[in-house]
A protein has these predicted regions:
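Flexible coil segments in periplasmic/lumen-exposed cytochrome c-class electron-transfer proteins
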Residues: 24-33, 37-41, 45-48, 95-161, ...
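Disulfide-rich extracellular modules and peptides
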Residues: 23, 53-56, 69, 115, ...
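Disulfide-stabilized extracellular ectodomain repeats and their linkers
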Residues: 48-51, 64, 91, 151, ...
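Bacterial N-terminal signal peptides that target proteins for export
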Residues: 1-11
């Protein structure tokens, strides 16, 4: 009887030990492996890691333009968005994310981000009949005429010289203009910043939306206010030794 109990106990112990050897020694269990960064194809982690810091966790509320704005997505098609994500915007805070441009994202990952942004936040038909200005400028702008356009459409919020007003922030600030490309300025003029209370091209003057050329001209005026070396408020005399 004791021998039988001994054999049963030994058999149970053997089964327990063998069950822990179902995989080769040192090999991680299935499902426990850490996913390589270039294999992540879920929008959530890709957006959180690469986009949310500037554009906001839910596509709005960040320092950069809201991606969850249907008007913006109505003027910037997938091709334009993908180009910006992949190649960035030189001279601004928007970096290139494609591996062939020095970034960390694969072509598939960029596809996931651009496709999902449009799928989640666009609203098909939102600009039907609106005749919005084109996403990219069709011709050169006239800065002198742009100053007139600014006075008509922008001054009431941003102040006479663009240094801030009762409703809007400074948009001729040296550092601001240094961080914004002409295309970014154009996009904001057209799409607005609804999360900040800034209207799109239709809302500055009721019943009188901005024309394509007026948008182009006011961007030319803003661009003409850029300075070569922003962020250097001290004159050379400050550094003269006495």
């Amino acid at each position: 009887m004791n021998r039988f109990r001994y054999l049963c106990s030994f058999a149970a112990l053997a089964v327990t030990l063998l069950s822990g050897c179902s995989s080769p020694h040192g090999q991680p269990q299935k499902g426990s492996e850490t996913q390589a960064p270039n294999e992540v194809l879920q929008f959530g982690p890709l957006y959180a890691q690469n986009c949310a810091g500037c554009h906001g966790a839910e596509g709005q509320g960040g320092a950069a333009i809201a991606l969850a704005d249907p008007v913006y997505l109505g003027i910037a098609d997938e091709k334009a968005m993908r180009k910006v994500i992949a190649g960035g915007v030189h001279g601004t805070s928007m970096p290139a994310f494609a591996q062939n441009s020095g970034g960390m994202l694969t072509e598939k990952q960029i596809d996931v981000i651009s496709n999902e942004i449009l799928s989640r936040w666009s609203r098909p038909g939102i600009l039907n009949g609106a005749n919005p200005p084109s996403y990219a400028a069709k011709s050169a702008g006239n800065a002198q005429q742009g100053e007139v356009v600014y006075g008509n459409y922008c001054k009431s919020c941003h102040g006479a010289d663009g240094q801030g007003g009762p409703k809007g922030s400074a948009i001729t600030n040296d550092s601001f203009l240094a961080l914004m490309s002409d295309q970014e300025l154009r996009t904001i003029v057209i799409a607005g910043r609804p999360e900040l209370g800034a209207p799109d091209w239709r809302g500055n003057v009721p019943g009188k939306p901005m024309s394509d050329q007026e948008v182009t001209d006011v961007v030319a005026w803003l661009a003409s206010r850029r300075v070569p070396n922003p962020g250097q408020p001290y004159s050379a005399s400050t550094f003269v030794q006495h």
